[in-house]
Amino acid sequence: MFTGIVIGKGEVAEKKLKSAGVVFVIDAKHWARKVKLGASVCVSGVCLTVTRKKGRKLFFDVMPETLKKTTLGGKNSGTRVNLELTLKAGDEIGGHFVYGHVDGVGEVIRVVEQGDNKLVTIRPAPELSRFIAPQGSVAVDGVSLTVASFDRESFTVSLIPYTLEQTTLGELKVGEKVNIEADMLAKLSVK
């Protein structure tokens, strides 16, 4: 389990095709030393298992189903990704509970600069709309955010300078796809 408070950005160093899926090699920078073999890491919102380590590089096996349901299939060498380590007992929960089980993909339809901040509007997959609520929580590429506004087809989040700097969300452009995980409480309340 995660909190949606990204520790930093990594970079896809290599993407190796295999018979069933892909091996992602991520340069996790200095964060790699904190990660153990077999650990779960949230990579741009997707919970993945570290299958190998080599210096600053972490290796992850990604199954075809994950590639199909997330944006990971479109990530190539040089692409930056958000990284978060698992929540441990006693850690501060600064965001909200994020599981790394992506509910679907959304598309960035508007980016507006507002002083040092940005307002980003995202159109989620239609089946996700019922789980998004104004002032509710949502994870976008693994980042815990508050929904600033919502209509039937899209929602907007406000990004402060710290989030823009520390995560890949500062690099978002119109037309880009993002991983979305709706808040578990919202999903349970609809059920």
Give residue spans per PLM region.
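Conserved loop->alpha-helix
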Residues: 1-191
